[in-house]
Amino acid sequence: PLTAMRINLEFVNDEELRDGLMRNLDELQVLTEQVLAAAKGAGGEKPRQVDLSALVESLCTDLDEMGEPVNWNNHSPAPISCRPNEIKRAVRNLVENAVAYGHKADVRIIDTADGYDVLVEDEGPGIPEDERQRVFEPFVRLESSRNEATGGTGLGLTLVKAIAEGHGGAV
């Protein structure tokens, strides 16, 4: 149905109206993809051995080629057992948030006693201390002024947390 709606919008003559409706349709598509990703998280993909460093580097390269300001700080191979598509989704959500609120993302992997941490850093305003738990609740968005400027559904960080916890990690 979303593709049919997108095709029909091409016939709307009012350019401003068409562009606004296209943006709404884009948001609906992102919401749909995120809800489906969350539903798949309950089952679906089986864990397998991958190189976390290569996985994250590939994602950063793809985003960089699409014009996203992403800096990847190379890491030696980092073998882990995970559901790679979920990990890619979580890192992508973090990078997209960093770019939306901090205008760029610096991504790196660090070795820890338990394995590896993926760090996504930006120069944005940060999340206020008293909002740091609430931001992981479904459909929660902070500051309405930021909502209009950055778009989004309020599911990105919810998915990040669910994926991290599903892999024995944390955000």
Regions found by a protein language model. Give the residues of each.
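Conserved micro-motifs of the catalytic ATP-binding
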Residues: 41-45, 79-82
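Conserved catalytic submotifs in the C-terminal HATPase_c
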Residues: 69-82, 110-113
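Conserved glycine-rich
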Residues: 168-169
